[in-house]
A protein has these predicted regions:
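N-terminal glycine/serine-rich phosphate-binding loop of ATP-dependent small-molecule kinases
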Residues: 1-81
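Gly/Thr-rich phosphate-binding beta-strand-loop-beta motif of the actin/hexokinase/Hsp70
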Residues: 1-23, 105, 111-133, 149, ...
Length: 241
């Protein structure tokens, strides 16, 4: 029984994987870290963790493994894994969460795709039909766009409006602008590829984007966890780090 952990910038996502399916999945902010772990239906035999949240979170995960007296392996990017090839100039510099999401995407969809992870940052990654990662984009996430305007201007609020095609108030204009900007990046990248490949959407803000996206798409819960599960099942060696 493997406890898969996706330690993102804003939240910790976890899933208990038994080798064939999920026993549970959940997500919390880091203040409630111990509460989530306390809700596990049974003790895991090991932990596989993907961490992009920094050293403090890394230490908390290590402390958890020590408390449970189980092994801990860190998922890191590599040149190839689980049928996916990494074409980054320096493969090890690709974010581990992006790499896990690409593996998850390849597991769930065998054709070419664009993989969108909408979190604190939004990443838009190209995966071809042979499982080769061809590169991608990084832009501020929806919430980060909103707070950047609030923190760096004198008069704009930290908006709590709604998406509108033609906004007529400031809050709606900010919310709609952030969503339009992200949709535009996704749709423009797809247009440059010149085909009708599927867009796979995941992450905390994915549900805000999906209703307005004008290309074929599929909304997936916890794509990073899906990649970790695939890695744990299919790869015989996990490099400790």
């Amino acid at each position: 029984m493997i406890l898969c952990l996706d330690a993102g910038n804003s939240r910790l996502k976890c899933g208990l994987f038994d080798g064939s399916g999920w026993r549970m999945q959940g997500a919390v902010n880091y203040q409630a870290f111990d509460d989530l772990i306390g809700e596990l239906p049974e003790k895991p035999t090991s932990i596989l963790a993907c961490n992009v949240a920094g050293e403090a979170v890394r230490l908390r995960i290590e402390a958890l493994a020590n408390r449970l007296a189980i092994s801990l392996d860190w998922f890191i990017s590599s040149a190839t894994s689980c049928g996916v090839t990494n074409s980054y100039d320096a493969p090890e510099q690709l974010g581990a969460d992006r790499w896990a999401a690409l593996i998850g995407a390849r597991t769930l969809h065998s054709g070419p795709s664009v993989v969108v992870m909408a979190g604190t940052a939004t990443t838009i990654d190209i995966l071809d039909g042979n499982g080769v990662f061809r590169g991608g984009l990084i832009l501020p996430g929806l919430a980060l766009m909103r707070t950047a305007l609030a923190h760096n201007t004198a008069d704009l609020p930290n908006a709590t409006g709604q998406f509108r095609s033609q906004p007529t108030n400031t809050d709606d204009a900010i919310i709609s602008g952030a969503i339009h900007a992200t949709l535009g990046a996704i749709e423009r990248l797809l247009a440059t590829l010149g085909d009708d490949r599927l867009c796979l959407l995941s992450g905390g803000a994915a549900a805000e984007l999906a209703p307005h996206l004008g290309v074929p798409h599929r909304l997936i819960d916890n794509l990073v966890l899906e990649g970790l599960a695939r890695y744990s099942r299919a790869c015989s060696s996990i490099a400790p780090h």
